[in-house]
């Protein structure tokens, strides 16, 4: 049987098991749309602060919902941020559905369950297909506030966050699935992914994504896929595996070795959205073909044009620089292209750079 197969996450049915991870600074609506074109079956927004979202709803293009129950957050004070339109557009692009995304989840983080409830309750206009609670981010500015992987130090916090997100989903979002992303643990002396996953499931989570590194490891060393294998054997909801997926062969190996339901590409997809179609080809046929540079050029320009349509050409060209670095990593003459891109200020500038590559 093919390793490429459908995945059922609560009430959500997905046609395949190749997912795009939330990656801060990269997985905005334009990149997620590109990845969907290339075969990503499910994608996640960059992590969004629940606190920031509900306190700055205008910036995110949302509005306070009308009260429809005593538990509605509509009567709670909200502070509009007053940002300029371009800043607002950038924020909106973090959480809105991409042009070609058929299925996507909005990922929230926050140490306070009340913040998660309020934020999740505002998401109905965006029509996400799931809410994902980030309990694995190792970044200091997230962890210092007790969110992200810091929640694994007190697994009961994960349960509270999931429970309140499920409640918000039921009351305001039609009961869409709530999922959770975790790590192996805080450090090597506190490997507690199984406990955290079980608590999340008891609170209502219907999928667990495991990045099998500790918070102390950050992204160093090798991820321990045996933790994924173990978790699959312990729980009944789908487990999505993440960590060290850089090639189609890596995806094939993880699915075979761990028995996970799906794989989630993160750094391996940055600048390489083609990894999804390549991985599907390998899983279904046993082989895959590299994408010609001409196709890569076309994707780079389409990505830039989508950004420009939403945040303006000048801002898009600045934002594209980091994406361009990822797209040109490892190709002949890539360093020279990246040097030229530093000075690119228009779509025409980027097109000229790519045509001369």
Task: Please give the residue ranges for each predicted region.
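Hydrophobic faces of well-ordered beta-strands that scaffold small-molecule active sites
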Residues: 18-22, 43-45, 104-108, 131, ...
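Alpha/beta catalytic cores of nucleotide-metabolism and tRNA/nucleoside-modifying enzymes
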Residues: 1-10, 14, 18, 24, ...
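Hydrophobic alpha-helical membrane-association signature
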Residues: 154-161, 299-300, 320
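Alpha/beta enzyme core
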Residues: 117-131, 135-147, 155-237
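Active-site beta-loop-alpha junctions enriched in small/polar residues
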Residues: 23, 48-50, 109-111, 136-138, ...
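Short secondary-structure boundary/hinge segments and terminal tails
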Residues: 53-54, 60, 141, 218, ...
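Glycine-rich, positively charged N-terminal anion/phosphate-binding segment
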Residues: 2-8, 23-72, 80-122
């Amino acid at each position: 049987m093919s390793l490429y197969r459908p995945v059922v996450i609560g009430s959500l049915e997905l046609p395949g098991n190749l997912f795009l991870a939330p990656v801060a600074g990269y997985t905005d609506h334009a990149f997620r749309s590109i990845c969907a074109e290339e075969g990503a079956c499910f994608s996640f927004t960059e992590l969004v602060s629940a606190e920031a979202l509900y306190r700055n709803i205008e910036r995110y293009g949302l509005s306070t919902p009308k009260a429809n129950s005593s538990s509605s957050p509509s009567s709670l004070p909200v502070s509009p941020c007053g940002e300029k339109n371009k800043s607002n557009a950038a924020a909106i692009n973090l959480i809105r559905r991409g042009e070609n995304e058929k299925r996507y989840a909005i990922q929230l983080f926050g140490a306070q369950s009340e913040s998660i409830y309020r934020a999740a309750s505002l998401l109905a206009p965006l029509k996400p297909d799931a809410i994902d609670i980030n309990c694995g981010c190792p970044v200091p500015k997230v962890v210092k506030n007790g969110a992200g992987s810091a929640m694994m130090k007190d697994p009961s916090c994960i349960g509270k966050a999931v429970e309140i997100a499920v409640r918000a989903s039921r009351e305001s979002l039609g009961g869409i699935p709530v999922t959770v992303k975790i790590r192996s643990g805080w450090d090597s002396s506190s490997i507690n992914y199984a406990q955290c996953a079980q608590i999340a499931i008891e609170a209502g989570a219907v999928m667990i994504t495991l990045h099998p590194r500790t918070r102390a490891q950050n992204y160093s060393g090798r991820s321990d896929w045996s933790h994924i294998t173990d978790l699959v054997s312990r729980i009944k909801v789908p487990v999505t595996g993440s960590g060290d997926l850089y090639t189609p062969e890596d995806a094939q190996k993880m699915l075979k070795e761990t028995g996970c339901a799906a794989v989630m590409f993160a750094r391996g997809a940055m600048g390489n959205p083609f990894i999804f179609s390549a991985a599907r080809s390998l899983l279904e046929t046993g082989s895959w073909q590299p994408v010609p540079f001409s196709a890569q050029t076309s994707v780079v320009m389409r990505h830039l044009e989508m950004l420009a349509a939403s945040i303006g050409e000048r801002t898009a060209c600045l934002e594209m620089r980091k994406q361009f670095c990822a797209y040109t990593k490892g190709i002949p003459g890539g360093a020279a292209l990246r040097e030229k891109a530093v000075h690119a200020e228009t779509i025409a500038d980027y097109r000229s750079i790519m045509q001369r590559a």
